[in-house]
């Protein structure tokens, strides 16, 4: 480290109310670890910011030393976009405050808070909003990437519920974006991710969700195709409050993959039981139908720490019978025994009803396939990664060509265009030039300045 860099680091330690870690500091390895254990990077400096002013100081520090800058919120990026080698990581995990305004049905969430913290804060008020399907995911990164979750068919995507963003730009300025303040920037933040600055807080619209219930029905492979078709019809004919997923994964402890149909409902257990009757009428191995606090339902798919991950997705125009056959056949090649999941989510409803000017381009998709590779042994890296890509290739005949960027890693510029819409790229590039002309914030699904 040069004398200039050493002096700047000493000054950063003095200036920040949060903590600063360099590779020789105790706690550095714990601070650099991210959700995906396959990502093993060694930043030169980790600035764990305590508040927005710390973020300003960290950005200016990184710019002064010409360091690559990554921004970590929940740390859930499968590609490890919240970290880097030999650069600066601006770590927001200490910015985790959640402030609920029940009268306004709104919540302000700091940039490092997770969905678990938000859900636990809003639940006592009978309120909720669309959030990621894992409670450990960061709110800000999820929302700014679009934000898919159990409530999206009735409440829209997380980005659809965005009321405001507090941002630190590439030159260290603090700005706000909303429908009334910097509206063009606000538009870009409905899916444009971290390209325009560090989100130190977001404000979201809340909805009344006083009751929530789930039905989980497990089927043997020979009954799976009928179960998936039945689930398709239940969702299509049911209320928008109904959602859920089809999830194939290894049977315990290491048996063949089993098909799990999860039917979620933002309403009463009694009403859910009526909706689930066609699924329960099929031959099945086990069933659970119960009322469940929404915050607990959000934890149902939390992956244990320490696993290696690779995942991707395709948005689908529909789920006809030939697709169902192909989807279920792919489960036969699921890497066993691992924690890998082969998932199918329904879209539609409020997702498709957003204004035409909204950024996310997959509004017309009816379903999303999300092969979710998770495993513990590095020896399984190749086969689990290959399986995810095989699923993508196999379902491409039904793909709309669009993709939800929160569901993919670093898959190249064509996938970024597919996730943001080719018709939006010029407009986004112009905004990028205005707010980040040097592409300081490029450890993301990157938009290049024009």
Spans of features found by a protein language model:
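Soluble FAD-dependent oxygen oxidases
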Residues: 1-450
């Amino acid at each position: 480290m040069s004398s200039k860099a050493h002096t700047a680091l000493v000054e950063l330690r003095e200036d920040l109310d949060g903590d600063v870690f360099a590779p020789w500091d105790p706690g550095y390895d714990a601070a650099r670890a991210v959700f995906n254990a396959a990502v093993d990077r060694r930043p030169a400096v980790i600035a764990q910011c305590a508040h927005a002013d710390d973020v300003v100081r960290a950005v200016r520090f990184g710019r002064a030393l010409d360091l690559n800058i990554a921004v970590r919120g929940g740390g859930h990026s499968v590609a490890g976009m919240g970290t880097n080698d030999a650069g600066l990581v601006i770590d927001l995990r200490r910015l985790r405050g959640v402030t609920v305004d029940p009268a306004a049905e709104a919540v302000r969430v700091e940039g490092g808070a997770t969905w678990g913290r938000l859900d636990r804060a809003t639940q006592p008020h009978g309120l909720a909003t669309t959030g990621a399907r894992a409670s450990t995911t960061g709110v800000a990164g999820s929302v700014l990437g679009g934000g898919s979750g159990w409530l999206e068919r009735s409440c829209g995507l997380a980005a659809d519920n965005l009321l405001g963003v507090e941002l630190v730009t590439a030159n260290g300025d603090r700005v706000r974006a909303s429908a009334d303040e910097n509206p063009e920037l606000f538009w870009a933040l409905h899916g444009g991710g971290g390209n325009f600055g560090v989100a130190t807080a977001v404000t979201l619209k809340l909805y009344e969700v006083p009751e929530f219930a789930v039905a989980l029905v497990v089927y043997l492979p020979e009954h799976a195709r009928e179960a998936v078709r039945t689930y398709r019809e239940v969702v299509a004919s049911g209320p928008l409050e109904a959602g859920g997923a089809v999830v194939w994964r290894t049977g315990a402890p290491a048996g063949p993959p089993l098909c799990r149909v999860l039917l979620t409902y933002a309403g009463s257990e009694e009403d859910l039981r009526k909706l689930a009757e066609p699924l329960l009428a099929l031959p099945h191995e086990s069933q659970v139908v119960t009322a469940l606090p929404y915050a607990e339902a959000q934890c149902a798919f939390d992956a244990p720490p320490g696993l290696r991950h690779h995942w991707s997705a395709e948005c689908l125009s529909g789920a006809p019978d030939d697709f169902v056959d192909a989807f279920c056949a792919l489960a036969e090649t699921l890497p066993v025994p691992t924690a890998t999941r082969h998932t199918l989510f329904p879209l539609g409803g409020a997702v498709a009803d957003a204004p035409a000017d909204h950024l996310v381009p997959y509004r017309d998709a009816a379903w999303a396939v999300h092969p979710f590779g998770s495993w513990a042994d590095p020896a399984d890296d190749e086969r689990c990664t290959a399986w995810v890509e095989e699923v993508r290739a196999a379902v491409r005949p039904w793909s709309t060509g669009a993709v939800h960027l929160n569901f993919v890693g670093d898959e190249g510029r064509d996938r970024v265009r597919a996730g943001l819409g080719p018709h939006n790229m010029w407009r986004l590039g112009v905004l990028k030039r205005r707010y980040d002309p040097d592409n300081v914030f490029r450890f993301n699904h990157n938009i290049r300045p024009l």
